[in-house]
From Swiss-Prot:
It catalyses: ATP + H2O + a folded polypeptide = ADP + phosphate + an unfolded polypeptide. Residues 520-540 are annotated as: Disordered. The keyword ATP-binding applies. This is Chaperonin GroEL. Forms a cylinder of 14 subunits composed of two heptameric rings stacked back-to-back. Interacts with the co-chaperonin GroES. Gene3D superfamilies: GroEL, GroEL-like equatorial domain, TCP-1-like chaperonin intermediate domain. ATP binds at T29, L30, G31, P32, D86, G87, T88, T89, T90, G413, D493. GO terms for molecular function: ATP binding; ATP-dependent protein folding chaperone; isomerase activity; unfolded protein binding. Belongs to the chaperonin (HSP60) family. Its EC number is 5.6.1.7. The gene is groEL.
């Protein structure tokens, strides 16, 4: 297909038009007085949201150059959202400000490469200053304050703080839709996976239809168990120890399953068999996780271990095991804390190197099961539109709160970015050409506060001047129009959110400024309509 190529200033301005269209749509949502945007859907009800990345994803432009410009800025919003769970609108506002000022300087004859270098050095200095000024999040109330700002609802903030208090910063907090009104929290203790008992005869608690064992042995096997001859030696050893047995294997069937069931019914020996979670390589990894957690070993011929030769020291242990029809929970595995920490570190490295959203999600789940736990927040609403919007807000607020716990918090409302940034840039030593890049960043760090005050109906220039003269950490409470100590008022941003927004905006601004040509698809001319059928509509 033929391509359309544009060079120099025309190329950059085409990209900027797309950026501005997207940014102007997104930035109206910034701050406590930000407005909503309604998104039409091809199917179902429209969505009402004030989340920057959700709005950005929906925008598709006709002009090929504008479309490319908009897509580049979508990446800024998406990357910030992935890393920090919030700050998407801030990152778009910062990118727009940097590109606008940068293109003015390029048009006036500035060297784009020196500009980009100046921007990168300036942003690194501001990021360092933000990290230095960050305050650690130590109390549940501080976590709740961060989550409340992101979600726009103090009740949601409190629930998220409770969830993180229970599962820790490595734990998984999932958000599900509920059929009832309100928001509720459910905490899962220990490691849980979605596989239940292979026979209802294993049940020990008839009322709850669950198998509950205290201090059982846990046999972990990566192959199918059908022959009772293979299973009998290890079962005999467990019977002699007077304990119960949980068997996790690829499958347990035939005479092996029948023997276990008969022994349970006759009261000779209590056991329960479940299928291993996952598939393929992921199953092997999850079995290894269970082995590390319980202090056992995976019985696998790949490592020279056979089921018929298994001894008690190869089996895992746990304080409690609960198995229902659909899931298995292992509480307080007896694995060594050093081995668990090593496994957690290994999974975290895989997480950092993974590009796939699906793989990252599964790795995060494994990490949580090993190191923290799982909390489920169930949210309900009156309409489907409200439910989707509320669920999305809670998901963002969870990531926001985790970011706060990870790197600490700074004054919100654009105050920390302006104050820390201004002082950091003042002392930065740059060449004369790079200093122009510093001026671009200095102008851009005012942009979020300007937009927040504009959305609140205030005069941006006056607000920026006032906040610049206030002590560090003081700023504008846009919901009331007062100038206050932001952290004591509970108005804060996770430093990771502010830092990610600034760094991602600078990255895309550098690409815009150093672009000399844009190659786009040439729109195909629409075929002319064919001649009308002269006989159409006539009745013969």
């Amino acid at each position: 297909m033929a391509k359309k190529i544009t060079f120099n200033e025309d190329a950059r301005r085409g990209l900027e038009r797309g950026l501005n269209t997207l940014a102007d749509t997104v930035k109206v949502t910034l701050g406590p007085r930000g407005r909503n945007v309604v998104l039409e859907k091809k199917w179902g009800a429209p969505v009402i949201t004030n989340d920057g990345v959700t709005i950005a994803k929906e925008i598709e432009l006709d002009d090929p150059y504008e479309k490319i410009g908009a897509e580049l800025v979508k990446e800024v919003a998406k990357k910030t959202d992935d890393v920090a769970g919030d700050g998407t609108t801030t990152s778009v506002v910062l990118a727009q400000a940097m590109v606008r000022e940068g293109l003015k300087n390029v048009a006036a004859g500035a060297d784009p490469i020196s500009l980009r270098r100046g921007i990168e050095k300036s942003v690194a200095a501001v990021s360092k200053a933000l990290l230095t000024s960050a305050k650690e999040v130590e109390t549940e109330a501080e976590i709740a304050a961060c989550a409340s700002i992101s979600a726009g609802d103090p009740q949601i903030g409190d629930i998220i703080a409770q969830a993180l208090e229970k599962v820790g910063k490595e734990g998984v907090v999932t958000v599900e839709e509920s059929n009832t009104f309100g928001t509720e929290l459910e905490i899962t203790e220990g490691m849980r996976f979605d596989k239940g008992y292979l026979s209802a005869y294993f049940v020990t608690d008839a009322e709850r239809q669950e198998t509950v064992f205290e201090n059982p042995y846990i046999l972990i096997c990566d192959s199918k168990i059908s022959s009772v001859k293979d299973l009998l030696p290890v079962v005999d050893k467990v019977i002699q120890s007077g304990k119960q047995l949980l068997i996790i294997a690829e499958d347990v069937d035939g005479e092996a399953l029948a023997t276990l069931v008969v022994n349970k019914i006759r009261g000779i020996f209590k056991s329960v068999a479940v299928k291993a979670p996952g598939f393929g390589d992921r199953r092997k990894m999850m079995l290894q996780d269970i082995a590390v957690l319980t202090g056992g070993q995976v019985i696998s011929e790949e490592v020279g271990l056979k089921l018929e030769n298994a001894t008690l020291d190869l089996l895992g242990r746990a304080r409690k095991v609960v198995v229902s029809k659909d899931e298995t929970t292992i509480v307080d595995g007896a694995g060594s804390s050093d081995q668990i920490a090593g496994r957690v570190s290994q999974i975290r490295k895989e997480l950092e190197n993974s590009d796939s959203d699906y793989d990252r999600e599964k790795l995060q789940e494994r990490l949580a099961k090993l190191s923290g736990g799982v909390a489920v927040i169930r949210s309900g609403a009156a309409t489907e539109v409200e439910l989707k919007e509320r669920k999305h807000r809670i998901e963002d607020a969870v990531r926001n709160a985790k970011a706060a716990v990870e790197e600490g918090i700074v004054a919100g409302g654009g105050a920390a970015l302006l104050q820390s940034g201004t002082s950091a840039l003042k002392d930065l030593q740059l060449t004369s050409e790079e200093a122009v890049g510093r001026n671009i960043v200095r102008s851009a760090i005012e942009a979020p506060l300007r937009q927040i005050s504009l959305n609140a109906g205030l005069e941006p220039g006056v607000v920026v001047g006032k906040v610049s003269s206030l002590p560090q950490g003081h700023g504008l409470d846009a919901s009331t129009g007062e100038y206050v100590d932001m952290l004591s008022r509970g108005i804060s941003d996770p430093v990771k959110v502010t830092r990610s927004a600034l760094e991602n905006a600078a990255s895309i601004a550098g690409l815009f400024l150093t672009t000399e040509a844009v190659v786009a698809e040439k729109p195909e001319p629409k075929p002319a309509p064919g001649p009308a059928d002269p006989g159409a509509g006539m009745d013969f």
